[in-house]
Amino acid sequence: MADENQTNNGEAAGAQAQQGAQFNIQRIYTKDISFESPNAPAIFTKEWKPEIKLDIDTSTNKLEENVFEVVLSVTVTATLGEETAFLCEVQQAGIFAIGEMPDQNKAHTLGSFCPNMLFPYARETISNLVNRGTFPPLNLAPVNFDAIFAAYVQKRAQQAQGEAPKMDA
């Protein structure tokens, strides 16, 4: 009886390990960094009321079976009137192992979940770069990657519907 329980517990542990192994962070790293302050030092004499523009983009590269690199590109541009105070670009990347799952779930994981994990690293890097440029602190607000991904999926679906009649013609 005790041997039977040990066997069942071992099988259950193995099944749980397989289920838990569907997602694994292999590495998070900074792929590229750029900080420019083209109008320094004159920009430091101006009143600091910048317009901040934030651009976010993601890309995914398949490295091998079920292993993907996700790159989150964040660009922050601060302008005072017509002058650029600073331009900060960060590519934060991660290598993720994603086990077997439906394509829709995998797309959501790569397009939303992974960028959401990378964003705090990119935000910290940008904050540090802006600080080293001796500009006032810049604290980027959280980003809703689920909403961004949902908009992307909806746009793709609309494009597919719009292109379908052209293919039939």
Swiss-Prot record:
Its main location: cytoplasm. It holds the Pfam family SecB. Keywords: Chaperone, Cytoplasm, Protein transport, Translocation, Transport. GO terms for molecular function: unfolded protein binding. One of the proteins required for the normal export of preproteins out of the cell cytoplasm. It is a molecular chaperone that binds to a subset of precursor proteins, maintaining them in a translocation-competent state. It also specifically binds to its receptor SecA. The keyword Chaperone applies. It comes from the Bacteria. It is found in: Cytoplasm. Homotetramer, a dimer of dimers. One homotetramer interacts with 1 SecA dimer. Transmembrane segments: none annotated. One of its GO terms (biological process) is protein folding. InterPro entries: SecB (IPR003708), SecB-like_sf (IPR035958). This is Protein-export protein SecB. Disulfide bonds: none annotated. Belongs to the SecB family. The lineage of its organism: Bacteria, Pseudomonadati, Pseudomonadota, Gammaproteobacteria, Alteromonadales. The gene is secB. GO terms for cellular component: cytoplasm.
